[in-house]
């Protein structure tokens, strides 16, 4: 039987269904505070499974204990009528997966800035002794200003806890480290590897490994050398290519030891300004951005003003100035 969409859960008034599978996500309103939130509810079929229920609540407890500007905030969690729910901040924008597919990630510098924010978020959870284990574009949200937020701690685990699922592959095939593929217990280094895959895809516009099924993907992860040619073709800075190569080293010990090193390398590239735009692959066209469609005289404005909000602000100032000119002009005419 299909789960009926609730009209209210606790103090949260449901406004719209946003999507989901094992969990349903809704846009809702906190009737006490008046703020808009995202409400994640475990579906009926999963709510009747004690293990699924326990994992959902574990995710909620873990995520609610983490506070960082680049990690989605969890405000509340609980259970109503046997269904666990989680209340998160409501985000405008889209997933990084959608942004990559629609070529809305911006220029090379903007893409590096997105990666840097993600790296800082992962570094923070590592300081909290948490391994995410599922770093991928679908689990990163990007707003219209390019602010990135890491989300979905569904299979995250405390770094010092050995889970019962060791011996099984846990994660998303394309982004799994070799040790995840082998079903070994993972450390922070697994997230470093997955970040390398994400950075590769973000800059090259394609995954480093392509295959038609999980078995072939796993074989390539374990045995095939990393193909760096797409990164060279995309004119990615050599220092960043080297960083990706190190992050995606098959032995965990050969990867950078922590995101302080990873983020430092990205920051250095941004400081040096050794950035090249990525040419569009043959036969593809990027969707024009809001800035691309501006008249040339507006494209010279500072970045904060090259947005709908910024232009609205300028329009308001212009209207006030025009009104003032007319008003004082009429006053002057009366005096004369």
Label every PLM stretch briefly.
Residues 43-65:
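AlphaC helix of the eukaryotic protein kinase fold
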Residues 24:
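Conserved N-lobe ATP-binding subsite of Hanks-type protein kinase domains
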Residues 81-95, 99:
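Conserved short submotifs of the Hanks-type protein kinase catalytic core
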Residues 77:
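Activation-segment/catalytic-loop signature of the eukaryotic protein kinase fold
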């Amino acid at each position: 039987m299909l789960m009926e969409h609730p009209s209210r859960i606790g103090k949260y008034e449901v406004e719209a269904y946003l999507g989901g599978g094992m969990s349903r996500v809704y846009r809702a309103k906190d009737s006490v505070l008046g703020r808009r939130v995202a409400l994640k509810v475990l579906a009926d079929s999963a709510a009747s499974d004690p293990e699924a229920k326990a994992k959902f609540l574990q995710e909620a407890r873990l995520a609610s204990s983490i506070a960082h500007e680049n990690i989605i905030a969890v405000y509340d969690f609980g259970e109503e009528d046997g269904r666990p729910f989680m209340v998160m901040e409501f985000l405008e924008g889209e997933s990084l997966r959608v942004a990559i597919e629609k070529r809305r990630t911006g220029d090379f510098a903007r893409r590096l800035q997105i990666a840097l924010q993600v790296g800082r978020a992962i570094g923070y959870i590592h300081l909290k002794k948490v391994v995410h284990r599922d770093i991928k574009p679908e689990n990163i949200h990007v707003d219209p200003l390019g602010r990135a937020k890491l989300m979905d701690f569904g299979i995250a685990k405390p770094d010092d806890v050995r889970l019962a699922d060791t011996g099984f592959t846990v994660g998303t095939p394309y982004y799994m480290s070799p040790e995840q593929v082998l079903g070994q217990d993972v450390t922070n280094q697994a997230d470093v590897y997955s970040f390398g895959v994400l950075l590769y895809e973000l800059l090259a516009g394609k995954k480093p490994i392509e295959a038609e099924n999980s078995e072939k993907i796993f074989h390539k992860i374990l045995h095939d050398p990393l193909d760096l040619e797409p990164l060279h073709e995309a004119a990615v800075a050599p220092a960043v290519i080297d960083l990706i190569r190190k992050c995606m080293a098959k032995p965990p010990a050969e990867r950078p030891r922590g995101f302080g090193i990873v983020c430092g390398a990205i920051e250095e590239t941004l400081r040096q300004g050794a950035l090249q735009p990525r040419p569009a692959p043959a036969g593809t066209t990027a969707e024009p951005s809001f800035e691309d469609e501006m008249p040339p005289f507006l494209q010279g404005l500072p970045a904060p003003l090259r947005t709908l909000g910024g232009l609205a602000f300028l329009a308001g100032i212009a209207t006030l100035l025009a009104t003032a000119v007319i008003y004082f002009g009429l006053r002057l005419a009366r005096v004369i």
